[in-house]
Amino acid sequence: MNDVSQKAEILLSSSKPVPKSYVPKLGKGDVKDKFEAMQRAREERNQRRSRDEKQRRKEQYIREREWNRRKQEIKDMLASDEEEEPSKVEKAYVPKLTGTVKGKFDEMEKHRQEEQRKRTEEERKRRIEQDLLEKRKMQRELAKRAEQEGDDSLLITVVPAKSYRAAANRKDPEDLDREHRNGRVSQEEEKTRHEEECRALKEAKCLSLVMDDETEAKKESRFPGKLKSTFEELERQRQENRKKQAEEEARRRLEEERRAFEEARRNMVNEEDESQDTETVFKEYRPGKLRLSFEEIERQRREEEKRKAEEEARRRMEEEKKAFAEARRSMVLDDDSPEIYKAVSQESLTPGKLEINFEQLLRQKMEEERRRTEEERRQKLEMEKQEFEQLRQEMGKEEEENESFGLSREYEELIKLKRSGSIQAKNLKSKFEKIGQLSEKEVQKKIEEERAKRRAIDLEIKEREAENFHEDDDVDVKPAKKSESPFTHKVNMKARFEQMAKARQEEEQRRIEEQKLLRMQFEQKEIDAALQKKREDDEEEEGSIVNGSTTEDEEQTRSGAPWFKKPLRNTSVVDSEPVRFTVKVTGEPKPEVTWWFEGELLQDGEDYQYIERGETYCLYLPETFPEDGGEYMCKAVNSKGSAASTCILTIEMDDY
């Protein structure tokens, strides 16, 4: 009985179907034991299957985790060599790699996935068939149990021939167990071999990727790649670069102008110091015979006036800078509240205060004009210094020659005149008269003033020359007429100095007149603009009173719809200067205010800054460009209605 029960248990635990012809005959007392044995075998089989399934899932989880780790390492290796990884993976044409390790790995990976899919499909079908067989087996066992407990006539009769045939076809349970174990061992070997192949292929792929990266670092890849950025991104980057370049150019130009102004101011101070030093040197080392007191006094007076004017202008400029800094500091202190400042670079808003840029424009123009005049003045002063040095050297040489040789030549001519007679004397006299008439009329007055001083000097020279040559008393009469010959040359040089001084004075006067005219024109423009603005405000107020706008305002305030107490106005600004659009809007509930440019909504940011303080709303542009010119609109919306106000911004180019 034990052998029969063991064989029945083995048959029941096996997965092969049991032929119906073989029914072992057991006693009625062993049916319960048989059922319990079947139940235990079924539970053990289920437990063994669940353990195998858990083990298989655990191994699969470990394999997948290892594969994901290796794949992440490969991705990290690839990402470390690339400069930038595109955030969005776009579909692109990737050529098929054949004849390389990558291509072989891809083919083997596809083949492995196909085999895995086939194995899973076969395993699923096998499990379904096994479940069906187990259900049929359970039904047969229940039927046998019912037959044994109930009617014996329902038992299946055993045919010897069929039983022999079935016994011949039936395999031994030990053979079945051996085959089952061999199949499981072969499956494990196949699984380990497959894992080793995958590991080898992964290592080969990593090596190939590293080698490919090294070769790509040395030479460009021959396979086409995808674009790293689209055309829109390139265009956006180009526009941003252009805008940054324009900002840097404006900043650089401003810095250069500031440095040039500082350099010019330092040079002007240095030149003033040098001019003072040169004046002291000239006063100390000037020759006694070239002392032109009138010209020197006049030049000193003009230089003193010029220095005073420059010091006054510099002092006024410093006062304006201090006043501007104090005003700006007070504005920052007044408007320093977290409601207004949405950014650190945002300027303060003072309600009721109108910013006018023509003060800054006037200051810039005055600085440009001052720099230009100072540069011209320095150049002319240098030229005059050079001419003065050259003339002084020439005059010194001529004076020395005249002092040493002039009188000797005169006395020789006088001796010749005594010998030649009165005709040559008359010709020489007419010659000197013509030379005297060649002097200009404007210089005659100053010549007469200097004649007394020169005459005394000439008399002393004549006396010394008379003593040297030991001439007769007749010589003391005629050299008096000849003594004016060197004086004519001095008169011409003096006239030349006078002409130069007069030309400089006229040029300075003309420049002062031009500056006055420009200042008057600019002030007149400011006055006209202020009067025009006041006239427009008066007309708007009168029109609002005449048209009954006060009642409309009262109706609008009662209705709660937004309306503009102070609408936008057309304005113009110089290129790269800041601009602010200010409106006053009221409404109940509080309206939401947005700003628009050429039909496009402007977002609050660094380029376009929204400022809000009570009913006053502002749009502030820290810096303007030529493309910022156009139509701007302020739109206010609440639940009761909406309102809008528009204006035109004009960008003027800075030509100076």
Swiss-Prot record:
Region feature (Disordered): 1-131, 165-198, 215-284, 468-492, 529-564
Major localization class: cytoplasm
Entry comment describing in which tissues the protein is expressed: Expressed in brain, testis, spleen and fibroblasts (at protein level). Not detected in liver, kidney or epithelial cells (at protein level).
Keyword field contains Cytoplasm: yes
InterPro entries: Ig-like_dom, Ig-like_dom_sf, Ig-like_fold, Ig_I-set, Ig_sub
Modified residues (Phosphothreonine): 350, 551
Localization of this protein: Cytoplasm, Cytoskeleton; Cell junction, Adherens junction; Cytoplasm, Myofibril, Sarcomere, Z line
Biased composition (Basic and acidic residues): 27-78, 103-131, 169-198, 216-269
SUPFAM superfamilies: Immunoglobulin
One GO molecular-function entry: actin filament binding
Assembly and interaction partners: Interacts with F-actin.
Descriptive protein name: Nexilin
Organism: Rattus norvegicus
Name of encoding gene: Nexn
